[in-house]
Protein backbone atom coordinates (compact mmCIF):
# COMPACT_ATOMS: atom_id res chain seq x y z
CA UNK A 1 0.00 0.00 0.00
CA UNK A 2 1.35 3.46 -0.97
CA UNK A 3 0.79 6.40 1.31
CA UNK A 4 0.70 9.98 -0.09
CA UNK A 5 3.69 12.09 0.87
CA UNK A 6 3.45 15.86 0.93
CA UNK A 7 5.95 17.53 -1.36
CA UNK A 8 6.01 20.66 0.81
CA UNK A 9 8.62 19.11 3.14
CA UNK A 10 12.12 19.10 1.82
CA UNK A 11 13.98 15.82 1.73
CA UNK A 12 16.55 16.80 4.42
CA UNK A 13 13.78 17.95 6.78
CA UNK A 14 11.80 14.76 6.21
CA UNK A 15 14.94 12.68 6.79
CA UNK A 16 15.69 14.56 10.02
CA UNK A 17 12.13 14.02 11.21
CA UNK A 18 12.39 10.28 10.45
CA UNK A 19 15.71 9.99 12.29
CA UNK A 20 14.28 11.81 15.31
CA UNK A 21 11.22 9.53 15.33
CA UNK A 22 13.41 6.44 14.97
CA UNK A 23 15.63 7.67 17.79
CA UNK A 24 12.66 8.15 20.11
CA UNK A 25 11.42 4.65 19.25
CA UNK A 26 14.86 3.17 19.82
CA UNK A 27 15.34 4.79 23.20
CA UNK A 28 11.82 3.99 24.33
CA UNK A 29 12.86 0.36 24.84
CA UNK A 30 15.63 -0.74 27.20
CA UNK A 31 18.80 -1.97 25.62
CA UNK A 32 18.29 -5.55 26.81
CA UNK A 33 14.53 -5.67 26.28
CA UNK A 34 13.14 -8.82 24.69
CA UNK A 35 9.72 -9.62 23.34
CA UNK A 36 7.48 -12.04 25.16
CA UNK A 37 7.37 -14.25 22.05
CA UNK A 38 11.15 -14.72 22.40
CA UNK A 39 10.88 -15.75 26.05
CA UNK A 40 7.77 -17.93 26.13
CA UNK A 41 5.43 -19.99 23.99
CA UNK A 42 1.71 -20.71 24.11
CA UNK A 43 0.82 -24.11 25.49
CA UNK A 44 -0.39 -26.45 22.74
CA UNK A 45 1.27 -24.50 19.93
CA UNK A 46 4.11 -26.91 19.17
CA UNK A 47 5.43 -29.03 16.28
CA UNK A 48 4.77 -32.75 15.95
CA UNK A 49 7.26 -35.29 14.66
CA UNK A 50 6.46 -37.48 11.65
CA UNK A 51 8.25 -40.57 10.34
CA UNK A 52 7.98 -42.83 7.32
CA UNK A 53 9.76 -45.62 5.46
CA UNK A 54 10.35 -45.40 1.73
CA UNK A 55 12.56 -46.11 -1.24
CA UNK A 56 14.99 -43.89 -3.12
CA UNK A 57 15.54 -44.78 -6.78
CA UNK A 58 17.67 -43.40 -9.58
CA UNK A 59 21.01 -43.81 -7.82
CA UNK A 60 24.14 -44.15 -9.95
CA UNK A 61 25.15 -47.60 -8.74
CA UNK A 62 25.50 -46.39 -5.14
CA UNK A 63 22.36 -47.99 -3.70
CA UNK A 64 21.91 -50.88 -1.29
CA UNK A 65 23.59 -54.21 -1.93
CA UNK A 66 20.32 -56.08 -2.05
CA UNK A 67 21.90 -59.41 -1.07
CA UNK A 68 22.85 -57.92 2.30
CA UNK A 69 19.67 -55.85 2.71
CA UNK A 70 16.70 -58.17 2.05
CA UNK A 71 14.23 -55.58 3.33
CA UNK A 72 15.02 -53.41 0.31
CA UNK A 73 13.97 -56.18 -2.09
CA UNK A 74 10.90 -56.94 0.01
CA UNK A 75 9.85 -53.28 -0.06
CA UNK A 76 10.43 -53.08 -3.81
CA UNK A 77 8.37 -56.21 -4.45
CA UNK A 78 5.50 -54.86 -2.34
CA UNK A 79 5.56 -51.58 -4.24
CA UNK A 80 5.62 -53.31 -7.63
CA UNK A 81 2.74 -55.54 -6.56
CA UNK A 82 0.66 -52.48 -5.66
CA UNK A 83 1.38 -51.13 -9.14
CA UNK A 84 0.15 -54.37 -10.73
CA UNK A 85 3.58 -55.84 -11.51
CA UNK A 86 4.22 -59.37 -10.24
CA UNK A 87 7.82 -60.51 -9.88
CA UNK A 88 8.22 -64.31 -10.24
CA UNK A 89 9.05 -65.94 -6.90
CA UNK A 90 12.70 -66.75 -6.41
CA UNK A 91 13.89 -64.02 -8.75
CA UNK A 92 17.33 -62.85 -7.66
CA UNK A 93 17.32 -59.13 -8.32
CA UNK A 94 20.72 -57.54 -7.89
CA UNK A 95 19.86 -53.88 -7.94
CA UNK A 96 22.33 -51.11 -7.23
CA UNK A 97 20.21 -48.02 -7.84
CA UNK A 98 17.65 -48.49 -5.04
CA UNK A 99 18.06 -47.67 -1.35
CA UNK A 100 15.79 -48.13 1.66
CA UNK A 101 15.48 -44.91 3.65
CA UNK A 102 13.79 -43.41 6.68
CA UNK A 103 11.98 -40.13 6.12
CA UNK A 104 11.46 -37.69 8.99
CA UNK A 105 9.74 -34.33 9.20
CA UNK A 106 8.39 -31.87 11.74
CA UNK A 107 4.74 -30.92 11.33
CA UNK A 108 4.60 -27.19 12.17
CA UNK A 109 2.03 -25.95 14.66
CA UNK A 110 -1.32 -25.02 13.12
CA UNK A 111 -0.31 -26.63 9.79
CA UNK A 112 -3.19 -27.02 7.36
CA UNK A 113 -3.80 -29.61 4.60
CA UNK A 114 -2.01 -28.69 1.40
CA UNK A 115 0.88 -26.95 3.15
CA UNK A 116 4.39 -28.02 2.05
CA UNK A 117 6.99 -28.96 4.66
CA UNK A 118 10.64 -30.00 4.46
CA UNK A 119 11.70 -33.62 4.96
CA UNK A 120 14.98 -35.33 5.83
CA UNK A 121 15.88 -38.60 4.10
CA UNK A 122 18.43 -40.96 5.69
CA UNK A 123 19.75 -44.27 4.41
CA UNK A 124 19.13 -47.31 6.61
CA UNK A 125 20.92 -49.90 4.47
CA UNK A 126 24.45 -50.04 3.09
CA UNK A 127 24.02 -47.53 0.27
CA UNK A 128 27.19 -45.60 -0.47
CA UNK A 129 25.44 -42.41 -1.54
CA UNK A 130 21.95 -40.96 -2.00
CA UNK A 131 23.17 -38.24 -4.32
CA UNK A 132 20.98 -37.86 -7.40
CA UNK A 133 18.20 -40.08 -6.05
CA UNK A 134 14.45 -39.58 -6.04
CA UNK A 135 12.25 -40.43 -3.08
CA UNK A 136 9.12 -42.32 -4.07
CA UNK A 137 5.75 -41.56 -2.49
CA UNK A 138 6.13 -42.14 1.25
CA UNK A 139 3.37 -41.72 3.85
CA UNK A 140 4.42 -39.87 7.00
CA UNK A 141 2.80 -41.02 10.22
CA UNK A 142 2.54 -39.54 13.68
CA UNK A 143 2.87 -41.20 17.06
CA UNK A 144 -0.79 -42.23 16.83
CA UNK A 145 -0.20 -44.17 13.59
CA UNK A 146 -2.29 -41.78 11.48
CA UNK A 147 -0.96 -40.43 8.16
CA UNK A 148 -0.42 -36.66 8.36
CA UNK A 149 1.61 -36.11 5.20
CA UNK A 150 3.00 -37.64 2.01
CA UNK A 151 6.59 -37.08 0.84
CA UNK A 152 8.09 -37.40 -2.62
CA UNK A 153 10.75 -35.59 -4.62
CA UNK A 154 14.38 -35.26 -5.62
CA UNK A 155 16.99 -35.36 -2.87
CA UNK A 156 19.37 -32.52 -2.18
CA UNK A 157 22.61 -34.01 -0.79
CA UNK A 158 25.27 -31.60 0.39
CA UNK A 159 28.17 -34.05 0.18
CA UNK A 160 30.19 -35.28 -2.77
CA UNK A 161 32.52 -38.23 -3.20
CA UNK A 162 34.55 -40.12 -5.78
CA UNK A 163 36.41 -43.44 -5.76
CA UNK A 164 38.73 -45.16 -8.23
CA UNK A 165 41.57 -47.70 -8.11
CA UNK A 166 41.30 -48.17 -4.38
CA UNK A 167 41.40 -44.45 -3.62
CA UNK A 168 38.43 -42.58 -2.21
CA UNK A 169 37.69 -38.93 -1.61
CA UNK A 170 34.58 -37.76 0.23
CA UNK A 171 33.41 -34.34 1.37
CA UNK A 172 30.60 -34.12 3.93
CA UNK A 173 27.94 -36.80 4.37
CA UNK A 174 26.45 -38.70 1.44
CA UNK A 175 23.90 -40.96 3.13
CA UNK A 176 21.43 -38.27 4.18
CA UNK A 177 19.74 -35.42 2.36
CA UNK A 178 16.79 -33.07 2.40
CA UNK A 179 13.86 -32.31 0.14
CA UNK A 180 12.77 -28.69 0.65
CA UNK A 181 9.00 -28.62 0.54
CA UNK A 182 9.05 -32.32 -0.26
CA UNK A 183 6.00 -33.32 1.78
CA UNK A 184 2.39 -32.20 1.61
CA UNK A 185 0.30 -32.02 4.76
CA UNK A 186 -2.78 -34.23 4.44
CA UNK A 187 -4.28 -33.85 7.90
CA UNK A 188 -4.25 -31.05 10.48
CA UNK A 189 -3.60 -31.64 14.16
CA UNK A 190 -6.49 -30.32 16.28
CA UNK A 191 -5.30 -27.50 18.52
CA UNK A 192 -7.39 -26.05 21.34
CA UNK A 193 -6.16 -22.51 21.84
CA UNK A 194 -6.97 -22.27 25.52
CA UNK A 195 -10.05 -23.27 27.49
CA UNK A 196 -12.70 -21.06 29.07
CA UNK A 197 -11.09 -17.97 27.51
CA UNK A 198 -7.80 -18.78 29.24
CA UNK A 199 -4.44 -19.64 27.71
CA UNK A 200 -1.18 -20.62 29.33
CA UNK A 201 2.23 -19.15 28.53
CA UNK A 202 5.22 -21.41 29.15
CA UNK A 203 8.63 -19.80 29.62
CA UNK A 204 11.45 -21.34 27.65
CA UNK A 205 13.62 -21.25 30.79
CA UNK A 206 12.22 -21.45 34.29
CA UNK A 207 12.72 -18.14 36.10
CA UNK A 208 10.42 -16.66 38.73
CA UNK A 209 11.72 -13.12 38.22
CA UNK A 210 11.07 -13.21 34.47
CA UNK A 211 7.61 -14.69 35.05
CA UNK A 212 6.75 -11.82 37.41
CA UNK A 213 7.97 -9.21 34.94
CA UNK A 214 5.86 -10.71 32.15
CA UNK A 215 2.78 -10.68 34.40
CA UNK A 216 3.43 -7.04 35.34
CA UNK A 217 3.86 -6.02 31.68
CA UNK A 218 0.66 -7.77 30.56
CA UNK A 219 -1.41 -6.41 33.45
CA UNK A 220 -0.06 -2.90 32.88
CA UNK A 221 -1.07 -3.01 29.22
CA UNK A 222 -4.40 -4.86 29.41
CA UNK A 223 -5.53 -4.28 32.98
CA UNK A 224 -5.08 -5.96 36.34
CA UNK A 225 -6.13 -9.58 36.53
CA UNK A 226 -5.36 -10.33 32.90
CA UNK A 227 -2.30 -12.44 33.71
CA UNK A 228 -1.29 -14.46 36.76
CA UNK A 229 1.86 -16.50 37.34
CA UNK A 230 1.24 -20.12 38.33
CA UNK A 231 4.92 -20.88 38.97
CA UNK A 232 8.32 -20.03 37.55
CA UNK A 233 7.44 -21.38 34.11
CA UNK A 234 3.66 -21.16 33.56
CA UNK A 235 1.59 -17.97 33.29
CA UNK A 236 -2.18 -17.98 32.92
CA UNK A 237 -3.62 -15.25 30.68
CA UNK A 238 -7.28 -14.29 30.16
CA UNK A 239 -8.15 -13.68 26.50
CA UNK A 240 -11.19 -12.30 24.64
CA UNK A 241 -13.85 -14.91 23.83
CA UNK A 242 -14.08 -14.23 20.06
CA UNK A 243 -11.41 -15.84 17.89
CA UNK A 244 -10.57 -12.70 15.87
CA UNK A 245 -10.24 -10.60 19.02
CA UNK A 246 -8.16 -13.35 20.63
CA UNK A 247 -5.71 -13.35 17.71
CA UNK A 248 -5.34 -9.56 17.87
CA UNK A 249 -4.87 -9.76 21.64
CA UNK A 250 -2.16 -12.42 21.39
CA UNK A 251 -0.39 -10.54 18.60
CA UNK A 252 -0.16 -7.42 20.76
CA UNK A 253 0.71 -9.32 23.92
CA UNK A 254 3.59 -11.32 22.47
CA UNK A 255 5.11 -8.10 21.08
CA UNK A 256 5.39 -6.52 24.53
CA UNK A 257 9.02 -5.92 25.48
CA UNK A 258 10.37 -6.65 28.95
CA UNK A 259 13.74 -6.87 30.62
CA UNK A 260 14.28 -10.56 31.46
CA UNK A 261 16.02 -11.41 34.70
CA UNK A 262 19.70 -12.18 34.53
CA UNK A 263 20.36 -15.83 33.86
CA UNK A 264 21.93 -17.82 36.70
CA UNK A 265 25.65 -18.35 36.53
CA UNK A 266 26.31 -21.50 34.55
CA UNK A 267 29.27 -23.30 33.03
CA UNK A 268 28.59 -25.94 30.36
CA UNK A 269 31.30 -28.53 29.73
CA UNK A 270 31.21 -31.00 26.84
CA UNK A 271 33.23 -33.97 28.05
CA UNK A 272 33.45 -35.49 24.55
CA UNK A 273 34.79 -32.49 22.66
CA UNK A 274 36.36 -30.51 25.50
CA UNK A 275 34.23 -27.43 24.77
CA UNK A 276 33.66 -25.11 27.72
CA UNK A 277 31.02 -22.35 27.59
CA UNK A 278 30.35 -19.90 30.41
CA UNK A 279 27.89 -17.04 30.64
CA UNK A 280 28.75 -13.59 31.94
CA UNK A 281 27.42 -14.31 35.41
CA UNK A 282 30.10 -16.94 36.08
CA UNK A 283 32.65 -15.65 38.58
CA UNK A 284 35.54 -17.15 40.50
CA UNK A 285 36.55 -16.47 44.08
CA UNK A 286 40.22 -16.20 44.96
CA UNK A 287 41.89 -19.58 44.77
CA UNK A 288 45.22 -21.17 43.90
CA UNK A 289 45.63 -23.54 40.95
CA UNK A 290 48.66 -25.78 40.44
CA UNK A 291 48.80 -26.92 36.84
CA UNK A 292 51.27 -29.48 35.58
CA UNK A 293 51.31 -32.32 33.08
CA UNK A 294 52.66 -35.81 33.64
CA UNK A 295 53.83 -37.51 30.44
CA UNK A 296 54.87 -41.16 30.14
CA UNK A 297 56.80 -42.04 26.97
CA UNK A 298 57.44 -45.70 26.11
CA UNK A 299 59.67 -46.28 23.10
CA UNK A 300 60.69 -49.65 21.64
CA UNK A 301 63.54 -50.17 19.21
CA UNK A 302 64.88 -53.37 17.65
CA UNK A 303 68.27 -54.70 18.79
CA UNK A 304 70.33 -57.14 16.70
CA UNK A 305 72.18 -59.78 18.69
CA UNK A 306 75.21 -60.89 16.67
CA UNK A 307 76.93 -64.18 17.67
CA UNK A 308 80.68 -64.33 18.15
CA UNK A 309 83.06 -65.31 15.33
CA UNK A 310 83.38 -69.03 14.56
CA UNK A 311 80.51 -69.83 16.95
CA UNK A 312 77.47 -71.94 16.24
CA UNK A 313 75.06 -69.20 17.32
CA UNK A 314 72.51 -67.44 15.14
CA UNK A 315 71.78 -63.79 14.63
CA UNK A 316 68.53 -62.89 16.40
CA UNK A 317 66.49 -59.74 16.75
CA UNK A 318 65.31 -58.58 20.15
CA UNK A 319 63.28 -55.64 21.41
CA UNK A 320 64.56 -53.07 23.89
CA UNK A 321 62.07 -50.78 25.58
CA UNK A 322 62.82 -47.43 27.16
CA UNK A 323 60.41 -45.82 29.59
CA UNK A 324 60.75 -42.11 30.30
CA UNK A 325 58.57 -40.06 32.62
CA UNK A 326 58.38 -36.31 32.14
CA UNK A 327 56.56 -33.89 34.37
CA UNK A 328 56.27 -30.26 33.41
CA UNK A 329 56.83 -27.82 36.19
CA UNK A 330 53.51 -26.92 37.76
CA UNK A 331 52.66 -23.27 38.26
CA UNK A 332 50.80 -22.14 41.38
CA UNK A 333 48.51 -19.41 40.11
CA UNK A 334 46.24 -17.14 42.08
CA UNK A 335 42.96 -16.74 40.23
CA UNK A 336 40.26 -14.24 41.06
CA UNK A 337 37.84 -13.24 38.32
CA UNK A 338 34.79 -11.00 38.41
CA UNK A 339 33.53 -11.69 34.91
CA UNK A 340 33.66 -14.23 32.14
CA UNK A 341 36.54 -12.50 30.36
CA UNK A 342 38.71 -12.48 33.49
CA UNK A 343 37.98 -16.13 34.23
CA UNK A 344 38.94 -17.22 30.72
CA UNK A 345 42.02 -15.03 30.73
CA UNK A 346 43.17 -16.42 34.06
CA UNK A 347 42.72 -20.04 32.97
CA UNK A 348 44.47 -19.44 29.66
CA UNK A 349 47.35 -17.75 31.48
CA UNK A 350 48.36 -21.06 33.07
CA UNK A 351 48.33 -22.81 29.70
CA UNK A 352 45.22 -24.90 30.29
CA UNK A 353 43.88 -26.81 27.30
CA UNK A 354 40.14 -27.55 26.94
CA UNK A 355 40.68 -31.02 28.38
CA UNK A 356 42.60 -29.53 31.30
CA UNK A 357 39.74 -27.11 31.91
CA UNK A 358 37.42 -30.05 32.57
CA UNK A 359 39.46 -31.15 35.57
CA UNK A 360 40.25 -27.60 36.70
CA UNK A 361 36.63 -26.46 36.70
CA UNK A 362 35.47 -29.57 38.53
CA UNK A 363 38.13 -29.05 41.18
CA UNK A 364 37.27 -25.35 41.53
CA UNK A 365 33.58 -26.24 41.94
CA UNK A 366 34.41 -28.79 44.63
CA UNK A 367 36.59 -26.24 46.41
CA UNK A 368 33.75 -23.71 46.38
CA UNK A 369 35.69 -21.21 44.28
CA UNK A 370 33.55 -21.45 41.13
CA UNK A 371 30.43 -19.33 41.65
CA UNK A 372 28.38 -21.02 38.94
CA UNK A 373 26.40 -24.13 38.23
CA UNK A 374 28.64 -26.69 36.53
CA UNK A 375 26.84 -28.83 33.95
CA UNK A 376 28.60 -31.61 32.07
CA UNK A 377 26.98 -32.80 28.85
UniProtKB/Swiss-Prot annotation:
InterPro entries: Flag_FlgI. It is found in: Periplasm; Bacterial flagellum basal body. The keyword Aminoacyl-tRNA synthetase does not apply. One of its GO terms (cellular component) is bacterial-type flagellum basal body, distal rod, P ring. Its main location: periplasm. Pfam families: FlgI. Residues 1-33 form the signal peptide. Keywords: Bacterial flagellum, Periplasm, Signal. Disulfide bonds: none annotated. GO terms for biological process: bacterial-type flagellum-dependent cell motility. One of its GO terms (molecular function) is structural molecule activity. Belongs to the FlgI family. PANTHER family: FLAGELLAR P-RING PERIPLASMIC PROTEIN FLGI, FLAGELLAR P-RING PROTEIN. The basal body constitutes a major portion of the flagellar organelle and consists of four rings (L,P,S, and M) mounted on a central rod. NCBIfam families: PRK05303.1. Assembles around the rod to form the L-ring and probably protects the motor/basal body from shearing forces during rotation. This is Flagellar P-ring protein. It comes from Nitrosospira multiformis (strain ATCC 25196 / NCIMB 11849 / C 71).
Amino acid sequence: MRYPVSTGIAAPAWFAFFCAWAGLWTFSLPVQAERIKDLASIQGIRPNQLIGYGLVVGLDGTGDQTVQTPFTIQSLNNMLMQLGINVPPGTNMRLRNVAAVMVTAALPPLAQPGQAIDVTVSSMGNARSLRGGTLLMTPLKGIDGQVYGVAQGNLLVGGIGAAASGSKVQVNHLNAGRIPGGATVERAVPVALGQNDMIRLELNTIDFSTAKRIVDAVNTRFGMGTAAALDGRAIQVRTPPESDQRVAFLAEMESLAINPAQMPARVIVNSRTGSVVMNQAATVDQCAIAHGNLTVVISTEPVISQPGPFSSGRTVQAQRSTIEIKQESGMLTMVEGASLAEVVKALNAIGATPQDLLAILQAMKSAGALRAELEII
